[in-house]
């Protein structure tokens, strides 16, 4: 399952002005150094403004809220001891050690 204590790690909050184009940027996920997922933000079915517009019809969104969306193809299981590194060009990387 995806929903358990400390199961949604995220990196530092950055001002939008420091990120460049929010609709363009390569992203990748490696597991133990092996590339598992690659994609680009321009491949998202729903763009960020569309997601915000839709969700705000049902939920009150506030500064600091996080909206999680889908992921590129290549989803697979991970195991205890695996090291996952997610990178988004122009934003940075986040490393997660599976425990």
Where are these predicted regions, by residue range?
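Catalytic-pocket segment enriched in acidic/His residues
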Residues: 1-99
